[in-house]
């Protein structure tokens, strides 16, 4: 039983991997792991550590199944009021920030992983993700059919 929020895509992924998706609120996750209501959960590494989940679930699997993204948004009206130089400066700052944040995030994540390993947490890397991806192909297909071009662009960016 793997903890999920009430999300059909996540439920499909969990089912594809052969687990039983179980809806548990985040606030109840620690006790749900502690009492066996669920056997596991998916969490960002920093959340896993900061919420003391290693105390009740001491195995961390690094499968890379999600990618967090944060966007800066601006209305067409506001963007149109900017000069071309201002627009270019914003785009350049965004690119610089993206690179800086990627480096910062990787450094912070590696630090947390080192701390977890030092404290006795069993950290398992999944070097061959292809079987995991194949197991989730059904839910991927079901949820990208109307956006196949965008999905392919994302895959191409990753490669």
Residue ranges and their predicted role:
Residues 1-159:
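N-terminal secretory/targeting leader peptides
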